[in-house]
């Protein structure tokens, strides 16, 4: 498998690449963005690529939502102080995604929601890249030096 590629069910997905300057701290709209936030954003985009792969494979439409939609329109990307990605799916597609995703996700990924966690109190799901913080070199490489758990909030519409 070529460097920078991920394997999903015999299919290859190329890892996102970023110029090193992307990860430098910067001030946008009067708000300082730490380099680690940039690493977290890049890691979230990797998780989003997995979602996109599954949705494309199974013809499941999704849309940017909440701060992600606002950031795309108003800031041309992330809102400087936002720390997550939000998407939504029509209810039937959302239910289908929740049924399909566990079979398609990389083993370290998992979905948290009211169906999977007894104490979960939100009306949306979170697709997470891991269950623990890790400084393992493979994970740091895969998620652009971000050791933290990152995920995507998925809202039913």
Please name every model-derived segment.
Residues 4, 8-31, 39:
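N-terminal regions that are enriched for targeting/export leaders
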Residues 52-85, 94-95:
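Active-site nucleotide-donor binding segment shared across nucleotidyl transfer reactions
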């Amino acid at each position: 498998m070529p460097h920078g590629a991920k394997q999903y069910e015999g299919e290859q997905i190329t890892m996102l690449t970023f110029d090193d300057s992307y990860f430098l701290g910067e001030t946008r709209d009067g708000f300082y963005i730490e380099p680690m936030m940039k690493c977290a954003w890049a890691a979230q985009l990797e998780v989003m690529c997995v979602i996109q792969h599954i949705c494309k494979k199974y013809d499941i439409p999704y849309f940017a939502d909440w701060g992600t939609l606002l950031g795309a329109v108003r800031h041309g990307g992330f809102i400087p102080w936002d720390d997550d990605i939000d998407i939504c799916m029509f209810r039937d597609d959302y239910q289908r995604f929740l049924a399909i995703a566990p079979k398609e996700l990389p083993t370290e990924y998992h979905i948290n929601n009211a169906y999977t966690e007894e104490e979960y109190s939100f009306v949306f799901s979170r697709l997470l890249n891991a269950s623990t913080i890790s400084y393992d070199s493979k994970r740091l490489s895969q998620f652009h030096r971000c050791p933290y758990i990152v995920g995507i909030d998925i809202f039913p519409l």
